[in-house]
UniProtKB/Swiss-Prot annotation:
It comes from the Archaea. It comes from Staphylothermus marinus (strain ATCC 43588 / DSM 3639 / JCM 9404 / F1). It holds the Pfam family NTPase_1. This is Nucleoside-triphosphatase THEP1. NCBIfam families: PRK13695.1 (NF010248).
Amino acid sequence: MKNYIITGRPGIGKSTLFNNIINTLRKSGIIVGGIKSPEVRDSKGFRIGFKIIDLMSNEEGWLAKRNYYSTIKVGKYGIVLDESSRIIREALRKALEKADVIGIDEIGPMELKIHVFRTMLEQVLNSDKPKILVIHYRLRDPSILDKIYRVENEKYVLTEHNRDLLNKVLPQKIVMEIKQIIKK
């Protein structure tokens, strides 16, 4: 079991690197499951929320919306609990059953407010499948961090100085290593 961890400040390119790695894995015949939660902006470039997307089926729904009424809030964003919980549960269940590699972008305060995410994340972290994990740079949850770091890890902290190089070399490096792990 091995975790590839991507972290860094907001806007540095973590999701770009994650997507690059996932696409490179897929092109090499490796089955990737999991979730990603990209931000959504309106026509003026103003962030209005976050989607949750199943990496295997591409099904998507709202994770959180700006000024959305919800019992669970993170800053100005209300969690769309029913929709996000359903997609998270199904995406991570399928990833555990059918994928060679599990990807999650990201493990952060917003996602961790969702009970289903915490429950499924624990199952993912206990799985022996290789994982590509984007971790919020301020994540301080000891129970989650302990589970992430109890196995072999490669951690990459993205900066302005290394992101271009990492986008060039890391996806292929990970493909070669994962092919050895899963014997594909």
